[in-house]
């Protein structure tokens, strides 16, 4: 079984949030810095690393030196059927391959929640069931929040920040995801007037994002891709 039943209150756990907004051969993700900063400075206790700090060496170092019960990765990802080496999560200067997840020692100390704020991280095939999410569970992670299709970084910003906000109030992962998705459906999570509006507060966005077209985050494209794999509690 990929799931280990049992409940642990995630609220005392710290989050390690890492991501990249600039890439040499892939489109930029300009909303990732806002995602990481909002999570670690307004929603949850933890540390964040952007771009140059998002390396495999630093990821391993942070996991070995500190007890992070939650790991959040915001970047590009690609799942390709076939060899596990073909599927990857993009780090700053390298790719984390599907078959390398187990080497991160996510079970010692145990990671209770892995958030993969990237494209198609819950997609799999018979050789790699549930893709990165399934591999993370096999590596010892209790639950993984991942995606079933290509997602926009604006949608990921809205969904993940609302998810952490809900998780701090109702510390059951599946219920926090349900409430976050409902908040997006109802239009309580939106980007307008250079502000990110969540269910109970708003966050000012950097001036460089002011010219970006604001999508309708209530559209299922932006919220329905996210799914929780593993322990629902």
Predicted region positions:
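A structural signal for short secondary-structure junctions
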Residues: 10, 65, 106-110, 137-139, ...
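An often Trp-containing, charged/polar helix-loop segment at the C-terminal end
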Residues: 156-233
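Soluble non-cytosolic domains of exported or imported proteins
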Residues: 30-34, 53, 126-127, 154-158, ...
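A domain-level signal for caspase-like cysteine endopeptidase catalytic cores
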Residues: 1-79, 116
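Catalytic cores of nucleophile-dependent amide-cleaving enzymes
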Residues: 1, 69, 73-162
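Hydrophobic alpha-helix feature that most strongly marks membrane-spanning transmembrane helices
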Residues: 44, 64, 106, 124, ...
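Residues that flank catalytic or metal-binding motifs in active/ligand-binding sites
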Residues: 14, 85, 222
């Amino acid at each position: 079984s990929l799931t280990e039943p049992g409940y642990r209150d995630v609220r005392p756990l710290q989050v390690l949030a890492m991501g990249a907004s600039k890439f040499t051969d892939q489109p930029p993700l300009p909303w990732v810095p806002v995602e990481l900063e909002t999570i670690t400075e307004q929603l949850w206790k933890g540390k964040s690393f952007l771009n140059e700090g998002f390396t495999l060496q630093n990821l391993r170092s942070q996991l070995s030196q500190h007890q992070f019960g939650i790991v959040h990765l915001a970047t590009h990802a690609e799942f390709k059927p076939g060899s596990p080496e073909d599927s990857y999560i993009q780090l700053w200067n390298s790719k984390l391959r599907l078959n390398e997840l187990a080497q991160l020692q996510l079970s010692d100390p145990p990671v209770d929640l892995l958030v993969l704020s990237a494209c198609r991280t819950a997609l799999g095939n018979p050789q790699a069931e549930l893709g990165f999410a399934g591999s993370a569970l096999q590596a010892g992670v209790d639950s993984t929040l991942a995606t079933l299709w290509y997602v926009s970084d604006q949608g990921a910003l809205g969904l993940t920040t609302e998810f952490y906000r809900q998780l701090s109030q109702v510390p059951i992962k599946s219920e926090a995801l349900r409430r976050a998705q409902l908040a997006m459906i109802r239009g309580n999570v939106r980007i307008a007037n250079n502000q990110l509006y969540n269910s109970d507060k708003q966050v000012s966005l950097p001036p460089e994002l002011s010219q970006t077209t604001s999508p309708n985050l209530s559209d299922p494209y932006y919220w329905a891709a996210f799914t929780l794999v593993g322990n629902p509690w």
